[in-house]
């Protein structure tokens, strides 16, 4: 991750997860994202749930993550 502005750690972590999802050559699993992002399991799953709820990421039936429809529309 890059420089963190005080009070924005959650936002920065969410951006890092979105970047990791977008950068993978194949849709990453949660295990892939744990390695790529260096977050704890509870933190990663909380972020993924939030991103899914906002339509910024989506989970496939195979358990992989893709950019969500709202993210693609930006």
PLM regions with names:
Residues 1-74:
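N-terminal helix-turn-helix
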């Amino acid at each position: 991750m890059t420089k963190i502005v005080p009070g924005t750690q959650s936002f920065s972590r969410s951006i890092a997860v979105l970047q990791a999802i977008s950068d993978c050559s194949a849709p990453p699993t949660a295990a892939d994202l744990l390695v790529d992002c260096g977050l704890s399991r509870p933190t990663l799953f909380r972020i993924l749930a939030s991103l899914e709820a906002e339509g910024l990421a989506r989970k496939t039936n195979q358990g992989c993550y893709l950019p969500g429809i709202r993210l693609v529309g930006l």
